[in-house]
Amino acid sequence: MSKIHVWVPDLFSTTGGIQTFSRHFLEALGKEVSPEGIRVLLKNDPPDAVHCDDGFRDVNAYGHWPTPLRTPRFASECLHRAWRERPRLIVSTHLNFGPVAQIVRDFTGVPYVLIAHGIDAWRLNSRSRQKALQKADLALAVSRYTRDWLVHKNGLDSQRVDVLPNTFSPDRFAIGPRSPRLLQKYGLTAQTPVILTVCRLAGAERYKGYDQMIRALPQILSEVPNTRYLLVGTGPDRSRIERLGAGLGVQDAVVFAGFVPDEELSEHYNLCDLSAMPSKAEGFGIVYLEALACGKPVLAGNKDGSRDALNDGELGLLVDPDDTTEIASEIIHVLRRQHPHPNLFHPEVLRQRVTELFGFETFKRNVADRLRPFLSVLVLSLAGVLT
């Protein structure tokens, strides 16, 4: 019985947008095809970190290999298993594995689908990866912004690129009161105006706009004193951010939460009056969906995939990410609860609408729709085996 092979960077050893997407993608695919019809190959997860409770049994992990050997080992295993098993389809949730998929297709005819997220697409500095992307049977982009980048910057045929928006787990996020424990931990009160950003603090992540938030704070504080900017996330850029805040005289208004485990994210979203990440190169932005599921107003940049996450402004505020005056002005109106946006201060409306647009049931239907030309053959094959 031919299966679908899904190649994934990792699912368990790190957290991030691609990991979250990959988990949801596998869950959706497993409900469409059944886990027995899928083989998963994980590059960076060690075998002892793998814990699949969704019926997946054919999972191969290579994260225990030394870093210098891991990439060639993973590539050789992908090639070997594809050659031996002749899958119906190969899906790679990262563009880096595209050249290997192209080799398989060239020698066996097995079709492949590549999924592009954001920074992986606009930092595609390898000719072999670009060629593999161009030759893919289908490229899926998580937003219109990423899709347009693939078409205009990487020369893809627009007929072979489609959009598969991100999703989230609504049951992990809920509208709730401010946690007294977290208020005490961060030196806040129930009345403190709080702006929240959730992201990794690293040089490569500055496009997410936390610098712009720091630069907007003097104007915000002049109108809404005692405001606190809560940064959730860790990374090597923290010391530079601290210096930036000190240079602007707003260091006391910036609160670093550090690493927060997934199970505590909902509580942190519920601390804030506004979740803000005015990015300018975000592929999509799952954090926007999470904040909206907690009923929180959201501010994002208007030049990237954030537009998709906020449904072109229906779900939140879209600002010029390079204009700190506009950023500050919009935030001030939200903190004063004077913004005219019709949905910002209606938590249940925000939660209901983001779930309708991006909840898992919608995502599952989207996966089935995008992969229908490939899945129909596999479903018929599985039906023949099971009868």
Residue spans for each PLM region:
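Conserved donor-binding/catalytic core segment of Leloir-type glycosyltransferases
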Residues: 7, 189-208, 214-217
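Short His-centered aromatic/hydrophobic patch
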Residues: 92-98
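Carbohydrate-associated surface elements
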Residues: 145, 167
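Nucleotide-activated donor-binding/catalytic signature segment of Leloir-type glycosyltransferases, i.e.
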Residues: 239-260
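Short alpha-helical donor nucleotide-sugar binding micro-motif in glycosyltransferases
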Residues: 259-260, 267-272
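Aromatic "clamp/platform" in nucleotide-sugar-dependent glycosyltransferases that forms part
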Residues: 280
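Short hydrophobic beta-strand element within catalytic cores of glycosyltransferases
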Residues: 297-300
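Conserved acidic donor-binding segment of nucleotide-sugar-dependent glycosyltransferases
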Residues: 311-313, 317-324, 333-339
